[in-house]
A protein has these predicted regions:
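N-terminal accessory/interface modules of nucleic-acid-binding and processing proteins
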Residues: 1-185
Length: 185
């Protein structure tokens, strides 16, 4: 294992032969996790069928979802901030449906944070959230592209970038936790 880290721990007080009080110590040998040879066992991914994933995705949704025959610009799903609703095209395949609905759902979640809603920024953040959810739940995310990052990532202020990325992480976590609860039922 290499060399352990030695930690000195007090073992209590004792009285010496001359009447003075002393403190006894024990040396504890500990190892850093990087010094071990054990490998973490990867949890086998739990695969859910597409219907269960979609059901979990829309479990306790923040806004109503309506099906439509077509949407502008060939979109599969769209969050409309004025109507506070998500519109979804009929006839999509399950993987595309998950990706599109998760993105629209993330936009709806981001719009409800109370901050000023900017569709451009929210669209990129929702794209990131959708990618995270797809990776977590085993959906094919090979079509996702991050070649054009949002303007908020082009700033020199690391605190601003951290704040924006935290919002992406928190939104993904909220939706993921909701989905996990729905899938447990």
């Amino acid at each position: 294992f290499g060399h352990p880290i030695k930690i000195v721990e007090s073992n209590g007080e004792y009285t010496r032969d001359d009447g003075s009080i002393g403190v006894s110590y024990n040396i504890k040998h500990v190892y850093d996790i990087s010094q071990t040879t054990s490998r973490m066992r990867a949890q086998p991914p739990v695969s859910h069928d597409a219907r269960a994933l979609l059901g979990a995705l829309i479990y306790k949704k923040p806004v109503p979802i309506q099906s439509v025959d077509e949407l502008p610009d060939g979109l599969g799903a769209l969050y409309d901030h004025e109507q506070e609703a998500i519109f979804v095209c009929r006839g999509m395949e399950a993987n595309d449906l998950f990706c599109e609905v998760s993105k629209a759902l993330a936009q709806a979640e981001l719009a409800q944070t109370g901050e000023e809603y900017d569709p451009q920024t929210a669209s990129f953040k929702a794209h990131c959230v959708s990618y995270i959810l797809g990776k977590e739940f085993g959906v094919d995310v090979s079509d996702y592209s991050f070649e054009n990052p949002a303007d908020f990532l082009r700033t020199d202020d690391p605190q601003e970038i951290r704040t924006e990325l935290s919002e992406i992480r928190d939104t993904a976590y909220d939706i993921s936790a909701r989905m996990a609860r729905a899938l447990e039922k």
